[in-house]
Amino acid sequence: MSEEKKDNPYGTPSTTGPEQPGESQERTNRIVRTLLRVPGLSKLVGKRLMTLHVVGRKTGRTFDIPVAYTKHGSVLLIGTALRPWVKNLAPGTPLTITRGGRPEQFDPLVHTAEAEVMRLFEVIARDNKQNACYNGIGFDAAGNPNKADIYQAWQQGGAVIELRPL
């Protein structure tokens, strides 16, 4: 993320930026976590959703975090803000996820550099317009993700998590 705010080189954003988690976010996450645990139903509900099982660095406690993802070649991509749980992800430390009711292990890499966030958020936005909207990314008349919006998401703490299979 940028240390200092600078003008958006891509022009004026079409949104105000990523949605801030509201008070209902934890309630929504609880419901989604439950639905993703139900055999059979998890494949329907979780077509673009999975649960990350993030282990706290200091507490050792496991946090189950439902997230939207995009499959990109052999990796999975997650567009998010730098939430506190993201700090617990480190390359070389396996991350367990549950997708389609099955646990899997991945090696996480958190991208925060402008160029990588811009490139990967565009991939995510093209694949999942609802996730793009949540991250404050609009689309131009031709249906392309708005680069000014992606830049704004990065400026406001946007990051992309790349999960590589183990």
Q: Where are the predicted features?
A:
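Short, structured beta-strand-loop surface elements
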Residues: 3-16, 73, 81-166
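A generic local structural motif
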Residues: 36-37, 64-65, 147-149
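Generic structural "secondary-structure junction" signal
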Residues: 46-47, 87
